[in-house]
Amino acid sequence: MDKIWRELGLTDEEYEKIISILGREPNITEIGMYSVMWSEHCAYKNSKPLLKYLPTKGERVIQGPGENAGVLDIGDNLAVVMKIESHNHPSAIEPYQGAATGVGGIIRDIFTMGARPIALLDSLRFGIPDDKRTKYLIENVVAGIADYGNCIGIPTVGGDTYFEESYKGNPLVNAMCVGIVEKDKIKKGIAKGIGNPVMIVGATTGRDGIGGASFASQELSEESEEKRPSVQVGDPFMEKLLLEACLELFETDAVVAIQDMGAAGLTSSSCEMASRGGVGMELDLDKVPLREKGMTPYEIMLSESQERMLVVVEKGKEEDVQKVFKKWGLNAATIGKITDDGMIRVIKEGKIVAEVPAKSLAEDAPQYIREEEVPKWQEDVNKLNINEVKPPEDMNKALKDVISSLNIASKEWIYSQYDYMVRTDTAITPGMDAAVVRIKGTKKAIALTTDCNGRYCYLDPYIGSQIAVAEAARNLCMVGAKPIGVTDCLNFGNPEKKEIYWQLKNSIFGIAKACETLQIPVVSGNVSLYNENEEGAIYPTPVIGMAGLIEDVSKICTMDFKKERDVIIILGENKGEIGGSEYLKVCFGMVKGQPPQIDLEEEKRLQELVLKLIDKGLINSSHDISEGGFAAALVESAISGKKGAKISLQTSLREDIELFSESPPRALITVSPEKVEEVLKIAYEYQVPAQKVGVVEGKKIAIEVNGKKIIDLPLEVLEESWRGRIKWEMERN
């Protein structure tokens, strides 16, 4: 056992701490249990001291961070349950199963709370698809998500995808799930009732995924390929049965507490439930249904076999549970009981093979406040002399290049593989500002989005993270939804490196600032660190998943142009910023400058204005202006509405900057001619600049700036560039 704890990811100091907790040397099973529970993946030991700065309270918050998922009150005795999680490391090694089990795990987090899952979203980051390995990762991640979601029958309605060099070999796969539950039927993972039986339900336990949580807490290296057994294998049909069986079980009064077995399997579900309830748990491993012979206590406690749950049952109700699971063709075995001594006691063949305090596993992991410093390259990348960037001679070509860039081009190649209409409640489908899902039996709907521009966060993690929150909220407002809650997935490199810790800290402070100002609480989330390989770290990528409430689904708005002669209006001010922009990268190969500055009070006014205009039925389309600036937003609205636009801009800015600056907060709206004056009047009341810039007409995009015609392109030419790019990249050799 020479220094085995080091191989499992524990430091010598952490090992000494375990000895002092137990008053003795731990055995191999106990070391394994601590190694997964004290891993970054389970314990958040590098991020917990920072996460406390996030605002988590609000009038709608029923359950904030600390449970399997966050819960928000949406009225009518209903609540929305939401959570996002990463499956980055497994997806880098075994992309199909890594992505599929990421989806499976997040779905379980939702129905564990008693909710029926109604929607999935995926936030994906890949390298540039110009080599075989990257294409292999993209194809298989997308297929894994599609197959799992499609088979289980939950629509994948939205998400976001970016391609940047920093994600090469280090893809990010963040899966978000949302469910609906009646408020009085919410379930929690708090074990109680001394003597109550503990049951394992669902699939059998095998050797897949052993040590997966520890694996997810390391940098990727050449050896990572050998860790394929650390990637779990998912079975969506089994999960569908488990989902229905659990929801049926919740209609009985048999369940005291329930938790899914995700990272760290039986170890985490037992110690977290026991710790929350201040009780202990005795587990007899001879009673666990196994799929492989000769499994050791270490393997059984650390297995991450999918589609399993741990349930604390009211004493005497075991048969009720078995009856439900038998009906669905699933296992339900009593493997232990609740005790009063706070210990997790593991028994095999009549002998105690592990005995540790539940609280020490779940709550006593050391927390680290790391040293930080501004990266040495930061000052250099933030310098941008605009005079070095010569305006392009051919603005038509510049526009085509920007809208066909990988980050702006249509993501149809990806989302067309997903079934986004299953359950028939999807009111706004992928490709718009936000997805919208109707809530059966009500007039309400939930709008959903995920957002984060990692390039902005690389240039300034504090500002970039504020923009991520602001853009997510703005996207929801564009469809007529009031933002109500955030679930965040913080993807960063190795926090033991001072410059990465600096990024993490500033990013969290940025999210906190934006959420406080916009009054949107963070109710759940996930942290994924050590996202780096031999090439270096990923861009800091704090993905913001956000939900918004629409009281009346008949009032939703979309970004597509609706009617010829509608007047096109820009809300908000263009401050002429091109640092970190798509234009700068695509047309000049530069990732430099400061990201656009954001005034959150201005953002708040713009969002409230758009919600007001949509509620009063004054606008026909609305689209946020972000990557690619006004020009990209205009083309997107035109393509999706199959109608052109004639634009005339007056500006003191350079032509290219006027078109491609990404200054927030801005929006592009269209208004019937007879309603224009009223819209401008209300915008003035909200102190939001509003400028008439043109009309919807014809089948081309024509733009003049200060009286000079600079863009004149048929819509079909633009559409071909925009729609075909990703498919073309994936199919060329």
Swiss-Prot record:
Gene3D superfamilies the record matches: PurM-like C-terminal domain (3.90.650.10), PurM-like, N-terminal domain (3.30.1330.10)
Catalyzed reaction equations: N(2)-formyl-N(1)-(5-phospho-beta-D-ribosyl)glycinamide + L-glutamine + ATP + H2O = 2-formamido-N(1)-(5-O-phospho-beta-D-ribosyl)acetamidine + L-glutamate + ADP + phosphate + H(+)
GO biological process: 'de novo' IMP biosynthetic process
Cross-referenced InterPro entries: PRibForGlyAmidine_synth_PurL (IPR010074), PurL_linker (IPR041609), PurM-like_C_dom (IPR010918), PurM-like_C_sf (IPR036676), PurM-like_N (IPR016188), PurM-like_N_sf (IPR036921)
E.C. number: 6.3.5.3
UniProt pathway: Purine metabolism; IMP biosynthesis via de novo pathway; 5-amino-1-(5-phospho-D-ribosyl)imidazole from N(2)-formyl-N(1)-(5-phospho-D-ribosyl)glycinamide: step 1/2
Residues binding substrate, per UniProt: 86-89, 108, 232, 304-306, 528
Keyword hit for Endoplasmic reticulum: no
Annotated region described as Disordered, given as residue ranges: 212-232
Top class in the EC scheme: ligase
Residues that hold ATP according to the record: 44, 83, 488, 525
Binding-site list for Mg(2+) 2: 109, 260
CDD domains: PurL_repeat1 (cd02203), PurL_repeat2 (cd02204)
Family, similarity comment: Belongs to the FGAMS family.
UniProt name for this protein: Phosphoribosylformylglycinamidine synthase subunit PurL
Gene: purL
